[in-house]
Amino acid sequence: MTNIRKSHPLIKIVNHSFIDLPTPSNISAWWNFGSLLGFCLVIQIVTGLFLAMHYTSDTMTAFSSVTHICRDVNYGWLIRYMHANGASMFFICLFLHIGRGLYYGSYTYFETWNVGVILLFAVMATAFMGYVLPWGQMSFWGATVITNLLSAIPYIGTVLVEWIWGGFSVDKATLTRFFAFHFVLPFIIAALAMIHLLFLHETGSNNPSGLISDSDKIPFHPYYSIKDLLGALILLLIFMNLVLFSPDLLGDPDNYTPANPLNTPPHIKPEWYFLFAYAILRSIPNKLGGVLALVFSILILMLFPILHMSKQRSMMFRPLSQCFFWILVADLFTLTWIGGQPVEYPFITIGQVASVLYFMIILIILPSISLLENKLLKW
């Protein structure tokens, strides 16, 4: 009799994806982040489900319902802070996962990469709508500012914004629909993640050298399942330390003040994981130009397969490209810092320089350096 995991129609799929999956023998800890993202998504869906049982999406009671969760619901404070900080952990893993893909040339798997970029957009949309739900000052004004950006679209902009708002300002209708979308999007993300895996398993995993590894593969279980479990435990340790010791470290104190349309906070800024894009948006004086730069700063990821000029896939043996990759990382840190600063000199100038550098490195410098490396290697 055949082993049930190889013969059962459902278990067979799991077996081919997580047990008998042939995996390169040399993949490093940087390949852990895919499974960690799955782990984060499960945490977010479970905690979110429990929060949704007590939350009310009405402008009059939303803020009070979150307070009620923290004070009166058993372990409500824990669930709420796990959900809020879970988003931060999700984005940390997401950025590291994308960074690994860029460094080791994983973007040459077109379908997997493009589904991944769509996933990034979906996660960003979900996080933005989730930030609006507690209905604090930063929730309200963040929603107002970000949705207002759509008014920069010629002809249909204003109508589009009012259609999204469900009125002439961010109000009850906006909150209700944001809650509905915030609830349903994680399940769409889970489905997209499965498509992402499906495309990945068509080609097999990349590895640090970027070379074909068909001749040297090992089964995923037990080797990498144990490695992923270790990664999950380390993530859980960092995550629970954050939740239990400094749950408000990454939040904004303004969000502990109920939303007031008559009082604007001194500095309106999104959560830390959007600050790099926010800095790019602010560094362009023109509204439409800023919005286009904002969208393109993420959409540019889809161009990486086209901009890949090197004869080698990975950056492992390309020291010049490595150098500029790390300059790009430093530039993103700079943009994140600038996004949280007030709009005044010298921050405006630093933001503009960092924004130009971001696009220059990706569109001009990295492809040029790749061509130079090809020349140096006489390829």
From Swiss-Prot:
CDD domains per record: cytochrome_b_C (cd00290), Cytochrome_b_N (cd00284)
Membrane topology note: Multi-pass membrane protein
Record's keyword terms, sorted: Electron transport, Heme, Iron, Membrane, Metal-binding, Mitochondrion, Mitochondrion inner membrane, Respiratory chain, Transmembrane, Transmembrane helix, Transport, Ubiquinone
Residue intervals passing through the bilayer: 33-53, 77-98, 113-133, 178-198, 226-246, 288-308, 320-340, 347-367
InterPro entries, A to Z: Cyt_b/b6_C, Cyt_b/b6_C_sf, Cyt_b/b6_N, Cytb/b6-like_sf, Cytochrome_b, Cytochrome_b_C_euk/bac, Cytochrome_b_N_euk/bac, Di-haem_cyt_TM
Residues that hold heme b b562 according to the record: H83, H182
Cell location: Mitochondrion inner membrane
GO cellular component entries: mitochondrial inner membrane; respiratory chain complex III
MF (Gene Ontology): metal ion binding; ubiquinol-cytochrome-c reductase activity
GO BP: mitochondrial electron transport, ubiquinol to cytochrome c
Stored PROSITE patterns: CYTB_CTER, CYTB_NTER
Disulphide-bridged cysteine pairs: none
Positions contributing to heme b b566 binding: H97, H196
Major place of residence: mitochondrion
Pfam families per UniProt: Cytochrom_B_C, Cytochrome_B
Amino-acid positions noted as binding a ubiquinone in the UniProt annotation, renumbered to this chain: H201
Cofactor: heme b
Cofactor note: Binds 2 heme b groups non-covalently.
Subunit text: The cytochrome bc1 complex contains 11 subunits: 3 respiratory subunits (MT-CYB, CYC1 and UQCRFS1), 2 core proteins (UQCRC1 and UQCRC2) and 6 low-molecular weight proteins (UQCRH/QCR6, UQCRB/QCR7, UQCRQ/QCR8, UQCR10/QCR9, UQCR11/QCR10 and a cleavage product of UQCRFS1). This cytochrome bc1 complex then forms a dimer.
Extra information: Heme 1 (or BL or b562) is low-potential and absorbs at about 562 nm, and heme 2 (or BH or b566) is high-potential and absorbs at about 566 nm.
Described purpose of this protein according to its UniProt entry: Component of the ubiquinol-cytochrome c reductase complex (complex III or cytochrome b-c1 complex) that is part of the mitochondrial respiratory chain. The b-c1 complex mediates electron transfer from ubiquinol to cytochrome c. Contributes to the generation of a proton gradient across the mitochondrial membrane that is then used for ATP synthesis.
Family in the record: Belongs to the cytochrome b family.
Annotated protein name in UniProt: Cytochrome b
Taxon lineage: Eukaryota, Metazoa, Chordata, Craniata, Vertebrata
